[in-house]
Amino acid sequence: MNEKNRISVVINTYNAEQHLDRVLTAVKDFDEILICDMESTDHTVEIARRHHCRIVTFERKQYNIVEPAREYAIHEASNEWVLVVDADEVVTPALRDYLYTLIQQEHCPDGLFIPRKNYFMGRFMRCHYPDHILRFFRKDKTHWPAIIHCVPEVAGRVEKIPAKRKELAFEHLANDTIENIVYKTNQYTRNELERKQHKHYGTMAFFWRPFFRFFKTYILKGAILDGRPGFIKAVLEGYYQFIFLAKKYEQSI
């Protein structure tokens, strides 16, 4: 295969043993699998070694977000093309074949948004599909800012896989428990407070922001079609907004 038609899979990990074996099995036919581990204390590194991955370590230090490690990892990759995969995401054979076909085209894009199927309480959540994420790109044209949930910046043409191509979507296995979601809500709202420390919200925001997030998820995005898990998910979306606003108020008194 032409050197320019090789793909490195980059996976950032921190105590990611739960799904890692399945995730790595799914990407075994790519040219390189690079694990960028953030000082895991479980069996993550052991699993990666068993799959013959190349492993680099990113010291967590003061970081409590993954984005700085993503920037480091993509530029540690050996190949021009990089596919970033989370440690709870499965790449389908159809997606792999699609990517290799794409990069052989003369006028292929420099970056690609890929749809993702999210699961909650064991159920595919239609309300969160297609959840496009920019995860495939030329590494030399890409910079990943050190901002939580930030989209990588690609200097070039970026395209998007159509939502109807569900066979090309990542399978997102997170399937978080309520306990994990509450834990992440605490983490994410803490980070959001840092980013919005100079922003102010009125009293009515305590009502309309949680309600609108619930309404948007349950009605506009269609969680109502996802049964009881859809209702619970919509409530949790509103809960996130309420916790953020409550913490914001707490800071001001």
Set out the residue ranges of the language-model regions:
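Acidic helix N-cap motif at the loop->helix transition within catalytic regions
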Residues: 18-21, 42-51, 94-95
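Cell-envelope/extracellular polymer assembly enzymes that use nucleotide-activated donors
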Residues: 6-8, 32
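Conserved donor nucleotide-binding strand/loop of the catalytic core
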Residues: 45-78
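Short beta-strand/loop segment that forms part of the nucleotide-sugar
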Residues: 30-40, 56-58, 87
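Short, well-formed alpha-helical segments that are part of the catalytic scaffolds
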Residues: 10-29
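A conserved acidic beta->alpha catalytic loop
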Residues: 26, 37-46
